[in-house]
From Swiss-Prot:
Chain residues that bind Zn(2+): 890, 893, 910, 913
Family annotation (Gene3D superfamilies): 1.10.730.20, HUPs, Ile-tRNA synthetase CP2 domain-like, Valyl/Leucyl/Isoleucyl-tRNA synthetase, editing domain
Assembly: Monomer.
Reaction catalysis annotation: tRNA(Ile) + L-isoleucine + ATP = L-isoleucyl-tRNA(Ile) + AMP + diphosphate
Short motif ('HIGH' region): ranges: 57-67
Keyword Membrane listed: no
Protein name listed in UniProt: Isoleucine--tRNA ligase
Cofactor(s) listed: Zn(2+)
Cofactor: binding details: Binds 1 zinc ion per subunit.
Gene Ontology molecular functions: aminoacyl-tRNA deacylase activity; ATP binding; isoleucine-tRNA ligase activity; tRNA binding; zinc ion binding
Keywords: Aminoacyl-tRNA synthetase, ATP-binding, Cytoplasm, Ligase, Metal-binding, Nucleotide-binding, Protein biosynthesis, Zinc
Length: 923
């Protein structure tokens, strides 16, 4: 007879090859048809909520690897929580207002001058929705489960309505005010410009080095030095109020031509060369931070210029001492706010100097350059004048140069709530811990928040003006505008006159004649997304504020984490989140930033096309995502190899359960053979470790633990020796059923454990588990596995861990014999061991299983370790002799034994196989 027919070889339709790029979309289609998101929500209804609030990506362009990392991390957490006792809704969002969309339309050839603001905004909205639909499909392809049909979108009427309420609440508390801030200003078109309305062209400008005499050295300088600044805008010198230095840079006091000057050490050589200093002596070196609060004198006005510290100071050019005019520069303004400097802006809207620049009033700023340079020369402050050609911002419409000029803007006060903000930070859990220090320092040091923008595409600032120009913000106007936006969307602001946006019959003391105008500025987009705690968490029934977790890239400490905190504390006095987790950036394999010019961009869509989403998700689980992470073809190849091993382990287990029904064939757990109970204990440890790692967001541990469990515990040990029993023994053999019981428990538990990370593969395994006890149609509809109680667990672990060490010794000896060509496969070997006393006791207790456990044909426990023959390999706990086994090879189980052929009916079989065949396969 053909003995092959009597072997119980693995049978499963679970394919060896993942073929994920083809199979994943089929699995996703099944999820969609099942409406899996709804099913999960229904199943977990009534459980405690766990809300991970999605930070909205900007609706523009295809998703990049940073998006993929972010969304996959969120999805892993949400999937785990919904399998471990929580109801975990996930509502994805999109950020849709702002400059990039305006710019994208302009690039597409939209001529905004030929249409009304309302018409242009309709095109912006249309474009945003196109981008959302594109990104939504890409996010879904990653396997991210969420309420994709009901996302939150910052341009939706209900969102804008809530945002207006946030603004109104802040205004009511006195946190919204008007103040000055420098913006791009075009004297030629007499208006503020957005960055999108700027184009860079070459311009010839004066380049001057100016000396500011020290007035009070604060014990750091002697008082007879001069601080040297460099600028290409002499017209801003009348507005100078400070000199900025970098706190961490070295500065030097140098003596030349009988005078002492202060410059950055790193720039001394270039400054000396430029000004023409011959012999220079370094008098002393000082850190920038030690120069803070030194007082210098303005070169030609009777006022002070304070030395301040600023992180924006560089050593790229100039002197390292930066002329600071808060009315004429973004950095100057921000650092000036920190030090409480005035915002002096002696230039009018047409670009002419005002009376705040005595001596230069009435001069066009460009002409003032010459007059001011002459004045500096007269007072002996000009060290060098030359001319340079450099790239300079111009008005894209008039093609004329722009200037930075302080204009009136709307602000949200951070100062008034700084204490509450810092307290809220303390009450929040920050992961990693350095996140707390980072955001604490940002909030501690930040100035007030400029929330107005002179653009078209955004949420209008809901302010009206009376006849005397006084701003009007009342509970009544806010409520009315919020309701209008909820009904019509914010475009209504641009379609109606002020009177038609106010409540009927509205009156105000500032407008005796009932004439009102409206604000035309819009809100900063960070105010949009920063209001999501109210516009999403409070607005929607399935969510709650505060969220349990915000999870974004580390750039969001200054972005969304910050703006959300500011608006939430302003409105509720509390943070909008209980915990904040941040991840790093995605770099290439060499640790370089990805860029088109370097050609090192790895695109998620490409990876999914070639390898599949589960490989990308496994990569996310493999990296230390709290720092910057690396990705490349070779890194993905390594991950794909780990995936292959995990998949093959699943396949082996599934294949060997084809004739197993847990209801009828399972062996009670405490009746399992000891080695099988040991594997259950190993499985218990895996379950505990993996669940703990999910709880602490430590996915890399899961990656390593699952990989080790599959390759070391299962493939290299348990499954390896189990084959002999699974394939060879009779179907109902107790040892075989014992192993199958372990395989069943393992495959079910392992599928659940990896489901949050590898949802497609887990789903596929789930479908292929024969006679599954849990009838749920998806692995997403069950909970994480529980550990299985085993009697005398500690004793089993101690004994079998010791055996595994012994096994390593014997395997080493087998490897040596194989390399020396003494044996071929291990089944051709006969092993004799000379154990130590402890080892003898251990081996003696499992003597009858040793041949199977070591996959050899003969295993003998001989004399004590001390009496081992000379030629034995001496290892830690045993001395080992390996020789070829004597006898014939059994045709059915391949064991080598002299007893082959003892049964005349089956001359090529060993007695064990002959017995099995006679009992179970004879006609």
């Amino acid at each position: 007879m053909d003995y092959k027919e009597t072997l119980l070889m693995p049978q499963t339709e679970f394919p060896m090859r993942g073929n994920l790029p083809k199979r994943e979309p089929e699995i996703q289609k099944k999820w969609e048809e099942m409406d899996i998101y709804r099913k999960v929500q229904e199943r977990t209804k009534g459980r405690p909520l766990f809300v991970l609030h999605d930070g909205p990506p900007y609706a523009n362009g295809d998703i990049h690897m940073g998006h993929a990392l972010n969304k996959i991390l969120k999805d892993i957490i949400v999937r785990y929580k919904s399998m471990s006792g929580y109801c975990a809704p996930y509502v994805p969002g999109w950020d849709t207002h702002g400059l990039p969309i305006e710019t994208a339309l302009t690039k597409k050839g939209v001529d905004r001058k030929s249409m009304s603001v309302a018409e242009f905004r309709k095109l912006c909205e249309q474009y945003a929705y196109e981008q959302i639909n594109n990104q939504r499909e890409q996010f879904k392809r990653l396997g991210v489960r969420g309420d994709w049909e009901n996302p939150y979108i910052t341009l939706k009427p209900e969102y804008e309505a809530q945002q207006i309420k946030v603004f109104g609440e802040m205004a009511k508390k006195g946190l919204i005010y008007k103040g000055l801030k420098p913006v791009y200003w075009s004297p030629s078109s007499e208006s503020a410009l957005a960055e999108a309305e700027i184009e860079y062209k070459d311009k010839r400008s004066p380049s001057i080095y100016v000396a500011f005499p020290v007035k009070d050295g604060k014990g750091v300088l002697d008082g007879d030095e001069k601080i040297v600044i460099w600028t290409t805008t002499p017209w801003t010198i009348p507005a100078n109020l400070a000199i900025a230095v970098h706190p961490d840079l070295d500065y030097q006091v140098v003596e030349t031509n009988g005078a002492k000057y202060v410059v950055a050490a790193a720039l001394l050589e270039s400054v000396a060369k430029e000004i023409g200093w011959d012999e220079v002596t370094v008098v002393k070196t000082i850190k920038g931070k030690d120069l803070e609060y030194v007082v210098a004198k303005h070169p030609f006005y009777d006022r002070d210029s304070l030395v301040i510290c600023g992180e924006h100071v560089t050593t790229d050019a100039g002197t390292g001492c930066v002329h600071t005019a808060p009315g004429h520069g973004e950095d100057d303004f921000i650092v000036g706010q920190k030090y409480g400097l005035d915002v002096l802006c002696p230039v009018d809207e047409r670009g002419y100097m005002t009376s705040e620049a005595p001596g230069f009033e009435g001069l066009f700023y460009d002409e003032a350059n010459k007059a001011i340079t002459q004045k500096l020369e007269e007072v002996g402050a000009l060290l060098k004048l030359s001319f340079i050609t450099h790239s300079y911002p111009h008005d894209w419409r008039t093609k004329k140069p722009t200037i930075f000029r302080a204009t009136t803007q709307w602000f949200a006060s951070i100062d008034k709530i700084r204490g509450e903000l810092l307290q809220a930070i303390k009450e929040t859990k920050w992961i990693p811990e350095w996140g707390e220090i980072r955001i604490h320092n940002m909030i501690r040091d930040r100035g007030d928040w400029c929330i107005s923008r002179q653009r078209a595409w955004g949420v209008p600032i809901p302010v009206f003006y009376g006849e005397n120009g006084e701003p009007i913000i009342t509970d009544e106007t806010i409520e009315h505008v919020s309701n209008l936006f909820r009904q019509y969307g914010s475009n209504v602001w641009f379609e109606r006159e002020a009177k038609d946006l106010l409540p009927e019959g509205f009156t105000h003391p500032s407008s005796p004649n009932g004439i009102f105008t409206k604000e035309i500025d819009i809100m900063d987009v960070w105010f949009d997304s920063g209001s999501s705690h109210q516009a999403v968490l409070v607005e929607r029934d399935d969510l709650q504020r505060p969220a349990d977790l915000y999870l974004e890239g580390s750039d969001q400490y200054r972005g969304w984490f910050n703006s959300s905190l500011s608006t939430a504390v302003a409105v509720t006095g509390k943070a909008p989140y209980k915990a904040v987790l941040s991840h790093g950036f995605v770099l290439d394999g060499e640790g370089r930033k990805m860029s088109k010019s370097l050609g090192n961009v790895v695109v998620p869509a490409k990876v999914m096309e070639q390898l599949g989403a589960d490989i990308l998700r496994l990569w996310v689980a493999s990296v230390d995502y709290q720092a910057d992470v690396r990705i490349s073809d070779s890194i993905l190849k390594q991950v794909a190899e780990v995936y292959r091993k995990i998949r093959n382990t699943f396949r082996f287990m599934l294949g060997n359960l084809f004739d197993f029904n847990p209801e009828t064939d399972a062996v009670p757990v405490n009746e399992l053979r000891e080695v099988d109970r040991y594997m259950i204990v190993k499985l218990n440890h895996l379950i505990e470790n993996v669940k703990h790692a999910y709880e602490t967001y430590d996915f890399a541990s899961i990656y390593h633990d699952v990989n080790n469990f599959c390759t070391v515990d299962l493939s290299a040990f348990y499954l390896d020796f189990a084959k002999d029993i699974l394939y060879i023994e009779a179907p109902n053999d107790r040892a075989r059923r014992s192993i199958q019981t372990v395989l069943y428990e393992t495959v079910v538990a392992l599928t659940k454990l990896v489901a949050p990370i590898l949802p497609h593969t887990a789903e596929e395994v789930w479908e292929h588990i024969p006679n599954r006890k849990e009838k749920e149609e998806s692995v997403q509809l069950v909970d994480m596995p529980e550990t299985i109680n085993i009697d005398e667990e500690d004793a089993i672990v101690a004994k079998w861990d010791a055996f595994m060490n012994l096994r390593d010794d014997v395997l080493k000896a087998l490897e040596v014999a194989r390399n020396e060509k003494v044996i071929g496969k291990s089944l051709t070997a006969s092993v004799t061991v000379y154990p130590t006393k402890e080892a003898r006791q251990l081996l003696g207790s499992i003597e009858e299983d040793l041949k199977q456990l070591f996959i050899v044909s003969e295993f003998t426990i001989a004399d004590d370790y001390e009496h081992a023959p000379e030629d034995a390999q001496k290892l830690a706990n045993v001395a080992v002799i390996v020789k070829p086994a004597e006898g014939e090879t059994c045709e059915r189980c391949w064991v080598v034994t002299p007893e082959v052929g003892k049964d005349a009916d089956h001359p090529t079989l060993c007695p064990r196989c002959a017995h099995i065949v006679k009992e179970h396969y004879s006609a």
